[in-house]
């Protein structure tokens, strides 16, 4: 009996703001996908250059949408609201897909029972002239077992949004991008998704991510403040169980993430991680004492236990 091949519609969404220099290469890479059951939605976020002229030159090969400028998150949301696909795939206007990006990820889904898993991979960095710089391969640093743990790759800054293939149902269940966030709208939403969804790391490199001068126009201070809020929010929202799942213990998780935050200059978040580490240590200390007291009461009775407590107090004052 011939096995049914899973071939759902995939929506490739390309948000563009003043992207005339690179967007044609991005659109061409989407059109060149070996997987053909796709729709390509280009969202013009109020561009003032030749973005519209370039987009319209593709005719009915793409779905073109125009909106007033509102930021990348709002442009992505516009595309999501208009897409028909069972899966969402983001392509930045200055990035490029490998021809087999979508096909390869759908082939992975064909091998999995759970079709609502988020698939992601590594990526290649290129310069403004499309010359290759180097590849970012998370599996060179971590095992696949760790890379398949929900939240692990996100909290190690291993996720590039354009590598993801996301089930559309997650937008229906969780929501869309927070349009008030200019720099962290992606990780803010991935955090919500990864807490409720299984993830699957694939070792293939399937996209090219471009580095160019136009990306440095944002003020560093504004970015820093938003990233500080992002990481502080993560720390406050994570449960004890999630920390243990990621690092084996809450203390190890907080210690490791404190190092990461300090290294990346997120001082406020770093200080919060240190404070939480101290709280966990103190909390664990008192929990240990209470456990010892209960054990002593059950085994030795109240008089012996009181004597032990007195000795503990004297010892702690030395």
Curated annotation (Swiss-Prot):
Annotated keywords: Glycosyltransferase, Transferase
Keyword Hydrolase (UniProt): no
Family: Belongs to the glycosyltransferase 2 family.
Superkingdom, taxonomy of origin: Bacteria
Protein name as catalogued: Uncharacterized glycosyltransferase RP339
Gene Ontology molecular-function annotations: hexosyltransferase activity
Organism: Rickettsia prowazekii (strain Madrid E)
One Pfam family hit: Glycos_transf_2
A GO biological process held by the record: biosynthetic process
UniProt EC number: 2.4.-.-
Coiled coil residues, start to end: none
């Amino acid at each position: 009996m011939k096995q049914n091949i899973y071939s759902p519609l995939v929506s490739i969404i390309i948000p563009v703001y003043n992207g005339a220099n690179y967007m044609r290469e991005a659109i061409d890479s989407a059109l060149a996908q070996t997987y053909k059951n796709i729709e390509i939605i280009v969202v013009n976020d109020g561009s003032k250059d030749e973005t519209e002229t370039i987009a319209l030159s593709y005719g009915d090969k793409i779905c073109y949408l125009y909106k007033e400028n509102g930021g990348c998150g709002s442009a992505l949301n516009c595309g999501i609201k208009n897409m028909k696909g069972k899966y969402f795939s983001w392509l930045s206007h200055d990035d490029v897909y490998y021809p087999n990006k979508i096909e390869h990820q759908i082939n992975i889904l064909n091998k999995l029972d759970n079709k609502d898993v988020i698939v992601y991979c590594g990526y290649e960095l290129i310069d403004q002239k499309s010359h290759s710089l180097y590849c970012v391969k998370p599996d060179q640093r971590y095992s696949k077992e760790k890379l398949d743990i929900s939240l692990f790759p996100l909290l190690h800054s291993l996720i590039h949004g354009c590598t993801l293939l996301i089930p559309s149902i997650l937008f229906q269940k969780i929501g869309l991008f927070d349009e008030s966030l200019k720099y962290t709208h992606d990780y803010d939403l991935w955090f919500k998704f990864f807490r409720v969804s299984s993830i699957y790391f694939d070792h293939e490199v399937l996209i090219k991510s471009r580095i160019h001068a136009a990306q440095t126009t944002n003020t560093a201070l504004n970015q820093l403040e938003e990233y500080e809020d992002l990481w502080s929010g993560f720390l406050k929202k994570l449960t004890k169980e999630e920390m243990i799942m990621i690092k084996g213990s809450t203390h190890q998780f907080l210690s490791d993430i404190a190092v990461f935050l300090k290294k990346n200059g997120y001082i406020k978040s770093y200080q919060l991680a240190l404070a939480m580490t101290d709280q966990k240590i103190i909390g664990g200390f008192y929990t240990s004492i209470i456990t010892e007291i209960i054990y002593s009461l059950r085994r030795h009775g109240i008089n012996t236990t009181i004597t032990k407590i007195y000795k503990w107090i004297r010892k702690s004052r030395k």
